[in-house]
């Protein structure tokens, strides 16, 4: 896909089984070189944990301010989450998130868990 210079953006419904199926089919059909996944930038290094064969949904990311448990946010993933399917596509297509022909980048929307 990189050779065409095109960018495709998929609008998805979080935790929507139909969105997850459609996204996985589109990624398989288009075979992109780069997959961008919206999420907290603090989780960039954690995405690679999805390569562990024991990591199976349901799973979640938890962001928090140490000592401030009320200042927390979480991002759940189920097998029918489009984000999970995008991560799994990337793993299946390249063998890992940091090597091979496919690059996965988590595009962050910073969680508002900072002190006010």
Predicted regions and their residues:
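Compositional signal for N-terminal targeting/processing segments
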Residues: 1-116
């Amino acid at each position: 896909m990189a050779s065409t210079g095109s960018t495709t953006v998929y609008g998805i419904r979080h935790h929507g089984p139909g969105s997850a199926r459609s996204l996985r089919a589109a990624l398989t059909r288009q075979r992109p070189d780069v997959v961008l996944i919206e999420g907290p930038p603090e989780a960039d290094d954690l995405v690679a944990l999805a390569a562990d064969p024991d990591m199976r949904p349901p799973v979640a990311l938890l962001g928090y301010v140490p000592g401030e448990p009320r200042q927390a946010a979480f991002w759940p993933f189920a097998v029918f989450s489009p984000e999970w399917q995008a991560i799994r596509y990337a793993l299946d297509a390249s063998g890992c998130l940091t090597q091979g022909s496919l690059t996965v980048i988590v595009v962050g929307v910073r969680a508002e868990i900072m002190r006010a």
